[in-house]
C-alpha cells in the first residue's frame, strides 16, 4: 500500500492499506 492516509481511486475512497485496494493509490 502507498501508506496510511492514502486512498485508492475508488468512489468510496477505500484505504490503501486495505486488501480491497486494487486501483492505483492517490496521495
Curated annotation (Swiss-Prot):
It comes from the Eukaryota. The keyword Chaperone does not apply. It is found in: Secreted. Transmembrane segments: none annotated. GO terms for molecular function: sodium channel regulator activity; toxin activity. Disulfide bonds join 1-17, 8-21, 16-25. Keywords: Disulfide bond, Ion channel impairing toxin, Knottin, Neurotoxin, Secreted, Toxin, Voltage-gated sodium channel impairing toxin. One of its GO terms (cellular component) is extracellular region. Expressed by the venom duct, in the proximal part (indicative of a defensive role). Signal peptide: none annotated. The keyword Disulfide bond applies. The cysteine framework is VI/VII (C-C-CC-C-C). This toxin activates voltage-gated sodium channels (Nav1.3/SCN3A (EC(50)=3.98 nM), Nav1.4/SCN4A (EC(50)=4.99 nM), Nav1.6/SCN8A (EC(50)=1.27 nM) and Nav1.7/SCN9A (EC(50)=2.42 nM)). It shifts the voltage-dependence of activation to more hyperpolarized potentials but has only little effect on channel inactivation. In vivo, it induces nocifensive or pain-like behaviors in mice when injected intraplantarly. This is coherent with the specific defensive role deduced from its proximal position in the venom gland. Belongs to the conotoxin O1 superfamily. This is Delta-conotoxin SuVIA.
